[in-house]
Amino acid sequence: MKKIAVDAMGGDYAPKAIVEGVNQAISDFSDIEVQLYGDQKKIEKYLTVTERVSIIHTEEKINSDDEPAKAVRRKKQSSMVLGAKAVKDGVAQAFISAGNTGALLAAGLFVVGRIKGVDRPGLMSTMPTLDGVGFDMLDLGANAENTASHLHQYAILGSFYAKNVRGIEIPRVGLLNNGTEETKGDSLHKEAYELLAAEPSINFIGNIEARDLMSSVADVVVTDGFTGNAVLKTMEGTAMSIMGSLKSSIKSGGVKAKLGALLLKDSLYQLKDNMDYSSAGGAVLFGLKAPIVKCHGSSDSKAVYSTLKQVRTMLETQVVDQLVDAFTDE
């Protein structure tokens, strides 16, 4: 049985969206048990009672505006810290939260701990592409500043995840840069390029540009945390703007626009599904001793369900154990 701890109080729509996502996952997957950390009365309001879900009542909650490291140190009885501690103590095998990203990163690093040999765990998510396949990108903001050796390690981590969790036999690894030529970029990216090109364990395809990200040019995209976070938010904003603009144009376009939308209904739904982050799961803080996964702050029950499904796959494939072995062998 796979044991997953969940922060029921994190996110914009907690605990309702969190608990409803858990209800669906418990219904669909008979091999998982969930520990919900948070306000028991609020959780019980939405929970479908089952022996495979337990509630650990907590009085404290880390808020979105709390200073991350300070909150983790001071709010030791919060749903987030206790959930992370459950993983450290072996009570749970993985932890999910839609709460304060910085605090979750701090809890992951200071409570759960990083794998020996991993310098900087990276925040990694599967991003949408127009063909629906997606690509893994890291770092998405766990580290604001990175060295070339960090990017080199991200490439190894990302390739390992794409192969062992997403089932891509030979993942194509690209370095996000301001041009595709080998000589492009600042000193950081030039040095990183040399390290990646010389790394025998990955299939490095060279530099890639941001404009090509959604065209499935790579399976893994490596970047520094500052740039990665900016790209993530740009992609989210662009997707929302495109869908909003289409909807507005159809509504205001009269009968012809509505008829055209009706004829294109299946294609429009496919586009919406391909651009939907909620079906891909959460962002993994990869490089820690256990799966620690961040749901989007505005996650609905579908996104929570997808994240539980993602974590279940990570536990099933034992990707973290394999990663520990890989770094031990180096």
UniProtKB/Swiss-Prot annotation:
Chief localisation class: cytoplasm
Enzymatic class: transferase
GO biological process: fatty acid biosynthetic process; phospholipid biosynthetic process
GO cellular component, one term: cytoplasm
Location within or outside the cell: Cytoplasm
UniProt GO MF annotations: phosphate:acyl-[acyl carrier protein] acyltransferase activity
Enzyme Commission number(s): 2.3.1.274
Keywords, ordered alphabetically: Cytoplasm, Lipid biosynthesis, Lipid metabolism, Phospholipid biosynthesis, Phospholipid metabolism, Transferase
Keyword Cytoplasm carried by entry: yes
Annotated catalysed reactions: a fatty acyl-[ACP] + phosphate = an acyl phosphate + holo-[ACP]
TM ranges: none
Pfam families according to UniProt: FA_synthesis
InterPro entries to which the protein is assigned, alphabetical: FA_synthesis, Phospholipid_synth_PlsX-like
Purpose: Catalyzes the reversible formation of acyl-phosphate (acyl-PO(4)) from acyl-[acyl-carrier-protein] (acyl-ACP). This enzyme utilizes acyl-ACP as fatty acyl donor, but not acyl-CoA.
PANTHER family documented for this protein: FATTY ACID/PHOSPHOLIPID SYNTHESIS PROTEIN PLSX, PHOSPHATE ACYLTRANSFERASE
Subunit and interaction comment: Homodimer. Probably interacts with PlsY.
Family, per entry: Belongs to the PlsX family.
Stated name of the protein: Phosphate acyltransferase
Species of origin: Streptococcus agalactiae serotype Ia (strain ATCC 27591 / A909 / CDC SS700)
Name of the encoding gene: plsX
